[in-house]
Amino acid sequence: GTFDRVMRGLRLLQKHGVEYNLLTTVNRINADYPLEVYRFLSDEAGTEWIQLIPIVERLDSDGLGLRLEGTDVSDRSVRPEQFGRFMTTIFDEWVRNDVGTVYVQTFEAAVRNWLGMSSGMCVFNENCGNALAVEHNGDEYSGDHYVEPKYQLGNIADTQMVELLGSDRQRQFGRDKSETLTKQCLRCEVRFACHGECPKSRFAVSDDGEPGQHYLCAGWYEFFTHIDRPVKAMVALREAGRPASDVMAIMRAEMPDVVTLASKAPRNSPCPCGSGLKTKHCHGATSTSDPPEPTTYPVFVAEPRRRVRESQ
């Protein structure tokens, strides 16, 4: 079937060292299975680069999704809270096991925003408009989600792309992303990370009753507030000259069963938290007779290791 053919093609790319990433859409069905989706992509498919794109299809009065109109969504569109749970669950798996070996575009963008850099994704930048969509016939549009007649800027055969990017019309399109935020967005604690997401899905109503709130606002808010502390830890590690992957040991140490596992582990074995220290010098230390080992190296050693999956 199609699945088998796709997997054969993927193995062929891997065999010849061809770089690729997997773009996975998140819909109302697979959003209920975050770990199954993530572990398939990272473990079974063996990919290192993952994009997770939420499906949000607006329906107009005719029940069609041909234009950016209407406030109803299709049955396959992911629900806001469902999407938030999906993303936070995958992040928790990633931040404990796969930092530095699996790259999830949304997570990378979040870290960049916490560092005060450009996220690298137009949806999470303050303004947009720097990435035109070009169709097969050369028609150019304001953005990938705006391939509609009223957003057509011209044709590449008639006008240089740089001219269209710098046009007053396109520049205003980009500024509209920040200039049309709702009051709820403007006072939001994670606005610096979200920036209202893509305007094409701002068709919901804010808590204040103001139109123009992003449909997935509740999900994104859950995600960005959830990752705040571990991402701040990654930023602190980076600023201290240590690899961001050291955060995995920090997060594993907070797993409820770490202390229990450490109490049962041989005292000279590596601590179950993944720090690289002996158990007796980490979570298995029971008295002052077991002083910490000298820390002339980073406490949390970021050596390649097999992924440690939490039991479900």
Can you name each region flagged by the protein language model?
Residues 142-144, 181-201, 219, 270-284:
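Local cysteine-cluster metal-coordination motifs and their immediate loop/turn environment
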Residues 242-312:
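Acidic/negatively charged segments and metal-coordination signatures
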Residues 205-229, 290-311:
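Short microdomains enriched in Cys/His and/or Lys/Arg
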Residues 215-257:
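Charge-rich, low-complexity terminal tails
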Residues 147-191:
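Membrane-interface junctions of multi-pass transporters
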